[in-house]
Design a protein with these regions (language model features):
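Compact beta-sheet-dominated domain cores in extracellular/mature segments
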Residues: 1-150
């Protein structure tokens, strides 16, 4: 019953997704949201604001392809969405799967609140946030990220 208490106490689990906290600025000078989403290796997760989020009747539309995907690789979806292990502050219902074609290969990409999720190639160290740029690319603050109905 203490899992998620006060937004600070969580059971030790092998999470696929984490919510980290950071208060400094990125090299580009964009303010970093205090909480932000990472994968289990600590890589920051981003959304591209030029993408169109999924709705209850439409799939997402990604504006990132080819060279863009080299710099911003898609976060591959797990074989079954139900296998995501999340902290209590995140809801499985906010995640989805988007099937896209990249270089002639079908890839299943994880989505959050309808938006396809990406990593930034230069962000190799846990906690690196060089991809957070006001406007185009945003590290995901789960509490503030636009809610949609996937």
């Amino acid at each position: 019953s203490g899992d998620g208490a006060s937004g600070r106490w969580y059971l030790a689990r092998d999470y696929n997704v984490f919510v980290a906290a950071k208060t400094d600025l990125t090299p580009q000078g964009a303010s970093m949201p205090a909480p932000y989403m990472t994968n289990r290796a600590g890589r920051t997760v981003y959304a591209f604001m030029s993408d169109t989020a999924a709705t209850s009747s439409k799939l997402p539309v990604s504006a990132c392809a080819d060279k863009c995907l080299e710099a911003w690789p898609a976060w591959p979806a797990p074989p079954a969405l139900e296998t995501l292990i999340l902290p209590a502050s995140l809801k499985l219902a906010d995640f989805g799967v988007f099937e896209r074609t990249s270089a002639g290969t079908s890839v299943k990409q994880l989505t959050y609140r309808g938006y396809p999720l990406y990593f930034h190639t230069p962000d190799v160290a846990p906690g690196a946030t060089s991809g957070h740029m006001s406007g185009a690319w945003r590290a995901i603050d789960p509490a503030m990220f636009a809610a949609t109905t996937p």
